[in-house]
Curated annotation (Swiss-Prot):
Involved in pyrimidine catabolism. May facilitate the hydrolysis of carbamate, a reaction that can also occur spontaneously. Its EC number is 3.5.1.-. Belongs to the AB hydrolase superfamily. Hydrolase RutD family. One of its GO terms (molecular function) is hydrolase activity, acting on carbon-nitrogen (but not peptide) bonds, in linear amides. Residues 14-115 form the AB hydrolase-1 domain. Pfam families: Abhydrolase_1. GO terms for biological process: nitrogen utilization; uracil catabolic process. The keyword Hydrolase applies. It catalyses: carbamate + 2 H(+) = NH4(+) + CO2. This is Putative carbamate hydrolase RutD. HAMAP family: RutD (MF_00832). Keywords: Hydrolase.
């Protein structure tokens, strides 16, 4: 898999892994790199079968496969333990990594994640599947911002979105790869295993997320033995992009704090 190592390069700097959502590209985390890089050795990677991690995703691909890929990457870098931050699908990878490779994850942040797929998220995924299969890649990519960003942000960034449309269409991961990765995501149900995930975990959500209702993060935090919850009032599904300042403040505050009894954080 393609990866980059950024931020602190001192021998004792803790390693932080950033894992994107369904798009898979590590560039999703660009708004966080400078802030996180002041404190961590930051590893960003492109999920297998996306962006610069070329390859064909096999039939039957699973969340366990995605977590094993990260574990292999960490071992190739001689990283025994890391902080892990994942957005949506990336957060699910983090949960799976903490379940099957618990020694590798010191602290975990799941951004807009869930214990099991919510009916609203399933509805959105079905619409996106239908767009891709019936209308093609450009229609799928053109609709994607509607699920990610608040309406006012969309209105204010129209030119940027037009530029991104061309780039994302040209670098699309491929229909088969996306559908197999999406199937793996939709089939994942952590409810039987949450009690076994003892890694300190922050469930971070935005109350105006159209794709993943905020109550999913509430359920996740409440079901984990060492789960905590943080909410943002605004930002949509990709609030790390739309409200970077608040997002980074919450994220860094939790990653750097010592463990205590605080269970709910606010921006």
């Amino acid at each position: 898999m393609y990866f980059e190592i950024l931020g602190k390069d001192t021998p004792l700097a803790p390693t932080l892994v950033l894992s994107a959502g369904l798009g898979g590209a590590g560039s999703f985390w660009q708004p966080q790199i400078n802030a996180l890089g002041e404190h961590f050795r930051v590893v960003v990677y492109d999920h297998f079968g996306t962006a610069r991690s070329k390859g064909s995703v096999p039939d039957g691909y699973s969340m366990a496969d995605m977590a094993d890929e990260v574990a292999q990457l960490l071992r190739s870098l001689n990283v025994d333990c890391c902080y892990f931050v994942g957005h949506a699908l990336g957060g699910m990878i983090g949960l799976q990594l903490a379940l099957t490779h618990p020694q590798l994850v010191e602290k975990l942040v799941v951004v807009n994640g869930w214990p099991t797929l919510d009916s609203q998220t399933r509805r959105c995924f079905k619409v996106r599947q239908d767009l891709l299969l019936n209308s093609g890649v450009e229609a799928y990519v053109r609709a994607q911002p509607l699920f990610l960003f608040p309406a006012d942000w969309l209105s204010q960034h129209s030119a940027l979105l037009d530029e991104e449309l061309q780039h994302q269409t040209a670098h699309f991961q491929g229909t088969e790869n996306l559908l197999r990765r999406l199937t793996a995501l939709m089939n994942t149900d952590f409810r039987p295993h949450l009690a076994d995930i003892t890694t300190p975990t922050l469930a971070l959500c935005s109350r105006d997320d159209l794709l993943v209702p905020y109550h999913c993060s509430h359920q996740l935090a409440a079901s984990l033995p060492n789960g905590e919850l943080a909410e943002m009032a605004y930002g949509g599904h990709a609030m790390s992009v739309t409200d970077t300042e608040h997002f980074n403040r919450i994220l860094l505050g939790w990653l750097l704090k010592t463990q205590n009894a605080q269970t709910r954080l606010q921006p």
